[in-house]
């Protein structure tokens, strides 16, 4: 993808991160943080174990991922990962996930994991599997 940059956000702006969460998650039933205040966002974003990266094509924001490095469990949890609709079908999801996984493996965890569900983008699971992830557990939950 021409002019693609993926950068760690050193200054984790709660308003910007909330915007990304809302805008990207609106079609995928991301609801758990909608009621968070900016202070709650700030507290979450300032955790030392959190990494928050933004993908840009040129100067346009195209997506993001965040993960938590659970050193005590030797695990990295990709907590959110998504791209704007305008970038669907262009291969950006694969690049962004590969970046997240490479970054996560730098922590030397025993595993990297992500929750996904049937409400996610139809290609999400295929993307995870294509990058070496496996289905660990399936469960039915009512939303």
What are the roles of these predicted feature ranges?
Residues 62, 135-136:
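Short hydrophobic beta-strand segments in globular cytosolic domains
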Residues 34-39, 45-52, 56-85:
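A conserved beta-strand-loop-helix scaffold within acyl/acetyltransferase catalytic domains
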Residues 88, 114-124, 141-143:
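Conserved beta-strand-loop-alpha-helix junction that forms the acyl-donor binding cleft
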Residues 80-83, 89-104, 125-130:
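Conserved acetyl-CoA-binding loop-helix of GNAT-fold acetyltransferases
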């Amino acid at each position: 993808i021409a002019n693609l940059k993926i950068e760690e956000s050193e200054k984790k702006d709660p308003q910007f991160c909330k915007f990304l969460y809302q805008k990207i998650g609106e079609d995928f039933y991301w609801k758990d943080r909608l009621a968070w205040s900016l202070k709650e966002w700030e507290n979450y974003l300032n955790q030392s174990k959190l990494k928050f990266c933004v993908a840009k094509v040129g100067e346009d924001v195209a997506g993001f991922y965040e993960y938590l490095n659970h050193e005590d469990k030797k695990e990295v949890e990709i907590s959110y990962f998504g791209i704007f609709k305008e970038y669907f079908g262009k291969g950006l999801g694969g690049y962004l996930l590969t970046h997240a996984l490479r970054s996560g493996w730098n922590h030397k965890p025993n595993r990297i994991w992500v929750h996904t569900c049937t409400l996610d983008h139809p290609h999400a699971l295929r993307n995870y599997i294509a990058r070496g992830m496996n289905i660990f557990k399936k469960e039915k939950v009512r939303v």
